[in-house]
């Protein structure tokens, strides 16, 4: 895990990180460290996938949690850095993790089907 998707830039100082260290720099530093240590990939926000792939290579896997469909409001959501399924895939995510939008839906199977349709549409459009 690079940085939990529930952590925002403003929380870094409270967690003991230097004031001049940005969240994106911390994520990239941790991804670089993971890659140099022989890891096949990292868990990261969809916002950071493109930058990670840029420094670690296209084959370095990016698993993206905190994925929220545009229509899927999650009450009391603790996630700070979220993306839609379309956004995660367009940014280069290899795998996405969608939990609460399906689990908490009135009809989970329908919600899952809509997310799958969004993924398929995005994959088709990206070619």
Language-model regions: role of each:
Residues 34, 52, 88, 99, ...:
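Conserved, mostly hydrophobic/aromatic
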Residues 43, 96-97:
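Conserved beta-strand positions in the central sheet of alpha/beta enzyme cores
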